[in-house]
Curated annotation (Swiss-Prot):
PANTHER family: GLUCOSE 1-DEHYDROGENASE, ZINC-TYPE ALCOHOL DEHYDROGENASE-LIKE PROTEIN C1198.01-RELATED. The gene is gdh. It comes from the Archaea. This is Glucose 1-dehydrogenase. Activated by molar concentrations of KCl or NaCl. Inhibited by EDTA in vitro. Catalyzes the NAD(P)(+)-dependent oxidation of D-glucose to D-gluconate. Displays broad substrate specificity since it is able to catalyze the oxidation of a number of alternative aldose sugars, such as D-xylose, D-galactose, and D-fucose, to the corresponding glyconate. Can utilize both NAD(+) and NADP(+) as electron acceptor, with a preference for NADP(+). Physiologically, seems to be involved in the degradation of glucose through a modified Entner-Doudoroff pathway.
Amino acid sequence: MKAIAVKRGEDRPVVIEKPRPEPESGEALVRTLRVGVDGTDHEVIAGGHGGFPEGEDHLVLGHEAVGVVVDPNDTELEEGDIVVPTVRRPPASGTNEYFERDQPDMAPDGMYFERGIVGAHGYMSEFFTSPEKYLVRIPRSQAELGFLIEPISITEKALEHAYASRSAFDWDPSSAFVLGNGSLGLLTLAMLKVDDKGYENLYCLGRRDRPDPTIDIIEELDATYVDSRQTPVEDVPDVYEQMDFIYEATGFPKHAIQSVQALAPNGVGALLGVPSDWAFEVDAGAFHREMVLHNKALVGSVNSHVEHFEAATVTFTKLPKWFLEDLVTGVHPLSEFEAAFDDDDTTIKTAIEFSTV
């Protein structure tokens, strides 16, 4: 079968041939439909994130997948089920407490593999196998865009944890600010638009000039575009308003600190970006004082698990059709897979199609 991989010492994905996998007991064989491309894939290709499977000279890419079960094997799945796989798997050392209690998304770095990212091959292949417990059934109507379920699930977890930090008191947020107008930021903005919290004012930070398709989406969602070149995060309260909730998806280290200044009293920020090392000066006293005297919180969040994928299938049904159409700017066949990795100002979200239902 064909697969898309990055090889050691190279910085461009290529198509390779691999044997079609055979499911072991407890696993199903899945025919891949589509696999999304995101910033993590670009980081893995560039060598800035992730790692190769032990003893292998390549890593099959892809962690945002949707497929159809072709061989249920000895599982309770059925042939024809549309499924989305989760990402984390036990490391080479075997299972650990996080996997044993079915919370692999809470495992610290080094205590897991991630398919298509670190230590385990991903889903950019014509077929893949997976244990049943890591496959989430989704409605057949979501098959075409099922590769969006994984990124939606990332925000489902972040919201769950951020909201839990405010659950000890009456918290009635009205403003939310998404930092980052990439595909994850835009998905999150759309999710906040339909969130049960009923946000009255939404904002999204970027650094692009008009005309721009992401700005068009932001404004179509009735949100305000904030250009960070004109209004840095710490100035947002003076120019717009204090924010009850902030979602950071830029990976820009200063945003973690500046978010505290932009939060309203009792507000919470969710940090999802994974930056490189960067040392800079911070008024630690002001930061500490602001957190304490105004009951603010910051929550770090990474990955997601089955319950978040299941919640994502529900959220998916609430997102406007026009939004999904505008968000996905390209679905490319395997023969033209390189186009899915293009990264320009007209590209928002892309996917590679391996087969159809």
